[in-house]
Structures are given as structure tokens and as C-alpha cells.
Amino acid sequence: MLERISIGVAALVTAVLATFASAQAFDDAKYPDWKGAWDRIVPTWIQPGDKPAPLTAEYQAIYDASLAAQARGEPGNAPSTFCIPQGMPMMMTAFDPMEFVVTPDTTYLLISHVNDSYRRIYTDGRDWPRDFIPTYTGYSIGKWADPDNDGRYHTLEIETRELKTPRVFDITGLPMHKDGQTVVKERIYLDKADRNFLYDEITTIDHALTRPWTVTKKYRRLPSSRPNWISQVCAEANSYVRIHGEAYFLSADGYLMPMKKDQAPPDLRYFNPTRK
């Protein structure tokens, strides 16, 4: 018994010492100053200057149908309407404040969004896992780059795979392919002229696109060095229900309401009273 305890204590001490050594080796001055909270300062959809997504004919038709549905007041392909997490790459196009936590082996990206979204970006030189289960944020591996050759890191280059489907790019419902093979590459860096602005070059490689597609998102550092984060849970305000592919609105008194003109009622056969 004592031998087991000694082994356990030794393992714990080893882990603590390894963490301490890693922290000691972390040269904060070598990394860019991304402290504070960052907020989007342009629209949450494709911003001016970006070229339209080069969608295939099949997925352009899906996108057009989503835009038409939203024009009628329906949710279209927007996943957050039904409490589905935004995930990547949509979470990087949202308007919610975000915060970076940089460590030697991992950069954490915390986003003050519904369900408190976050990302882990591994920068420890690891390879891709063999049996990772796809998630909304995917699996991200990054590396720091020094494009100015001044001995300091300026850019975080990231590749994200293993994204759970269905997936859209932004709130307009721009669709990604359902095969789950989406790859998102990013380059995040500060504005050289004004360190209070941050850019994220997002390149999406996807079979719904005829070629890789790059857009650039811009963020502004918020004035407060101690921002207040608001925790939200989507279920608290979820008023939409999807049944057999059809969306319905849930009224304040708990009744299903149609989302469009002449919409057929949902099939509630299992709720019908049993006839004797």
C-alpha cells in the first residue's frame, strides 16, 4: 500500500515539476501581446472586399434557399437558432468578445457566446490524433511564426480538422459540405500600425467549394483591461423547434406556432389520445 502511495506521489511531483519547468521556460516577451478582450468591428457575415464563396452548383442552391428562407423570417440554415453551437469557422465570425490565453504548449481562445464557446490550439508539436471524434470546434494544431525575423513571434498559424456536421460558415447559413472533410487554416496577427487591432485570415478548404476560400476578419481590443464576461445558456431562450426538417415557433404559453404561411402542422401521432 505504501509502495502504491509513493508511486502516486512521485508521479504527482513529476507532473508538477514538469509544469513548473514549462512555465519557467515560457518567455512572455517573445509572444505577441494579445491580452484583454477582442470584439468584432465588422458585420458577422462576409465583409466588404471579400469575394463571394465559390460554392458548387449543389451547395449554391442550398445557400440560395437558406437566404430566401431568412428573407421570409425563417431561420434557414443558421444552426444557433436551434441551440446548436456555432463551432468552427462560424465562431470566429461572430460578434461576441473573445480572449486569448497563451501558454507554451496550448493557446486557449475563450468566446463570450451562448454556451461559453472555447478552443484549444495545440502548439506543442503534436501530430494529428488517429481516433478523434468530430466536435463543433474540431481539433486545432498551431505553430508560432516569426515572419519579421526579429526573434519574436508575430503570427499564430492554425489548422483545424475533425469538424462535426452539419456546418455553416456564418449567420447567413453559408453551407459547408456534409462529408465532414472540412479543413480550416488561419493566420492570426496584430496590426503593425495599431496593436489594438487583430486580424484572422481564414482559409476554408471544403468540398462544397470549387477552390480554397479566404476571408479576413478584423477585431478590436476593448478598452477595459478587466472585461466582464456574460455566461449564457441557449436553452434559456430557445423558442424554435425542428420537427422532421420543419421549423416551428414555440410561443410563450408553450404552444407550437407556424413559421411560414400555410405551414402544415407537425406529425404528433404519438400524442393523440388512445381511442377505445
Model-derived regions: residue spans:
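Hydrophobic small-molecule pocket/channel-lining residues, especially in calycin-type beta-barrels
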Residues: 2-6, 19-276
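Hydrophobic helical h-region of N-terminal Sec-dependent signal peptides
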Residues: 10-20
